[in-house]
Regions:
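FMN-binding flavodoxin-like domain, especially the glycine-rich phosphate-binding loop
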Residues: 2-4, 11, 18, 22-34, ...
Length: 154
């Protein structure tokens, strides 16, 4: 059985945590929140996930700073996920670039990436009730579960 962990930073409305829980349920992963600063599990796991919301076109700074401090590894399987105000495949590639680059430079092999919309009340949006209310929704959760199942086949 594959041993999996997910490093998670979920802020505001816990959108990314909902997605992390869905993926974790399919790959039997332990979720480690970044504020715990726990990296020991990395040594013994086969698959590592990294998830955080997107802010200004990249993962939250807390996730990027955490990734920078990780030890180097050799060809360890990893995946990236996020929630954001706007979703498209092209945007996901761009938004994940900073974290992907850090992880690849540390020796991780990225085997999958996932993104979906999340409820957003940042900046002026709070005055209008936000955007993407109800997201991630049931379809997003199902897609995250399917993503998790695909990770096990990689």
């Amino acid at each position: 059985m594959i041993k999996s962990i997910i490093y998670l930073y979920s802020y505001h409305h816990k959108n990314t945590q909902k997605i992390g829980n869905a993926i974790a349920g399919k790959i039997n992963a332990k979720i480690i929140e970044l504020h715990n600063n726990e990296t020991n599990a990395l040594e013994t796991c086969d698959l590592t996930g990294f998830g955080a919301g997107i802010d200004s076109g990249k993962h939250y700074p807390q996730m990027l700073q955490f990734a920078e401090k990780l030890p180097n590894v050799t060809n360890k399987k990893a995946f990236i996920f996020s929630t954001s105000a706007i979703h498209s495949d092209k945007k996901t590639v761009k938004d994940h670039k900073a974290l992907r680059s850090i992880l690849e430079n540390k020796g991780f092999r990225i085997i999958g990436e996932f993104n979906c919309k999340g409820f957003n009340t940042n900046s002026f949006l709070r005055y209008f009730g936000g955007m993407n209310k109800g997201c991630p929704n049931d379809e997003d959760i199902k897609n995250a579960e399917k993503f998790g199942e695909k990770l096990l086949k990689e």
